[in-house]
Each structure stands twice: as structure tokens, then as C-alpha cells.
Amino acid sequence: RCPFFYFSDMVLAETTCDGKKKMYELMSELKHCHIMQLPPGKTGRGALEFWKQEVISVKEDLEDFYHIRITDEQIRKAIHLRNRERKAVLDFFEIGRLKPTPITGYEINTVISSNEFTVDLEEKIKYLEHRTAELKELYEKEYKGKPSRPRVLITGCPTTGVIDKIVRQIEELGADVVGFENCCGPREKKDPIDETKDPITAIAEKYLRVNCSVMSPNPGRLEALDAQIDEYQVDGVVEVLLQACHTFAIESDAIRTFVTKEKGLPYIAINTDYSSGDQAQINTRLGAFIEMLG
């Protein structure tokens, strides 16, 4: 059970995945739900203004529900704090750029996901900054100049629910997962909210820029993948496709073509779910893939 849902007064949701949209209808029977309606694309006429009104609607619902008033100055302070958090998370993710990496992809994924349960953002920032500094020191003392194992980048769907069957398995088979170009990776963290603009407008602009597969078209994902492959010195790409996420599945053909043709790297797509029934098959395919990486 999710502790957030149990202890929450209301749920803030958005219309990304179709399954989630229907789930929120059921959740609304238990909690007050505010559902933000996403525009179908980033660049369509009126997309930004539409999304800005959705952000305003959230603010108004929070004020009505909690009987409070949210000022622009309070929003600016929250933006500044969240930008600091983004920087701390991004710096931690980018430890994977070191070669050889002093941290496993399993730890990266676990630390980031577990810290989402930290309510005190100052505490979260402090922990991540401290752990990042520790890992940089460890790299200088014990890893720098040593041979590196094959370096794998994960792309596609969120990996939190399949971390053991995919991320851990890759590393047990002899490769290092050094980066994540997916929903739980540094994608959103690289782009802070503009602190010089009207706060509502800045929030709307920032979240409309996220390279999510539900947006059509979504060229920013290829640009981000291109940069991350180079920055992390990647040897191969593993795309995780959860069975219910059709938008990522559709994009996978373009991703495969880009990785193999444009970047000249090995690529494999793993179609899976949260069950363990396909573990043996995944192990076999990942084992063969990692052998290709040398």
C-alpha cells in the first residue's frame, strides 16, 4: 500500500497514461482528486495557455480545499527549493558519467526512488549532496584509471517496479548500468524552472517541455538520448517497455533506429510487466546482449 495515498487529504493527478486516467476515477471515490488535463502536444496552438490555466486551476483548488491563500512569493520560494532539489538529484545521477562508475545502477535507482518518500526536502538535498561527495571521493581513490565494464543506458518506461528483474540482472551479468533516460531518470531534473518569470507561467512552460512519450510529436526525447549516450560514454542501450505503456512502445522503433543507425550502438527492447514469469527469458536475452558488448 502507498503511504502517501493513505495519509493524504487530496490527490493531484494528470492525464498521461490511459490506465492512470481511469484509475483516478476510482480513486476519486476515496479521496478528493484534482486531475490536470494535459494538452496532446507541446507546440500546438494554445497548448501553453491551456496548460497555464490547468496550473492556475490547481492553485485555486488547493486554496479552496485547504481554506488558504497561495501568494506568488510563496510559489517563488517553492520553485527555488525545488530547483535546488533538482540540482542535487541531477548531480547524484551524473556520478554515472564517471568511468569506471563507482556506483551501481541499482543503487542509483534505489536511492532516488526511496528518497521520494522524504517529506523534508532540505533533508533530501543534504543527503544527496553528501552521498554525491562521498562517491566522487571514492572514484578518485579507488576507481580512477581502472578498466571499465560495459556501460549500459536504460531508456523507456519507469524501472522502479522492475529494478530487480532488469537493472540488477544486467549488473550481475557483467555490465554497469550508468544512466537512465526514462521517467525516473534525470530527464526532468536537467531543466529547472525559470525563477525570473511570473511563477505560474514559468511552471507551465517547464512542465510542458518534459520529453514524455504521451506528447505528440516528441522529438526532444531523441535529442536528450543523443546527449546522454555521449555524456555517459555508453556501450549499449536497453529499452524497458511495460506492457500497458503503448506510447513508449510506439516510440521504440524510432529509438532502435536512432541508437543502431545514428549512434552505431547495440540496442535491445525488453517488453515486460511487474510479474516474475518472464525472468528466465529476460536473463537469457540480457546475457546474450551483454556478450555483444564485449
Label every PLM stretch briefly.
Residues 1-72, 178-179, 183-184, 188-294:
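Trp/Phe/Arg-rich N-terminal binding region typifying the photolyase-homology
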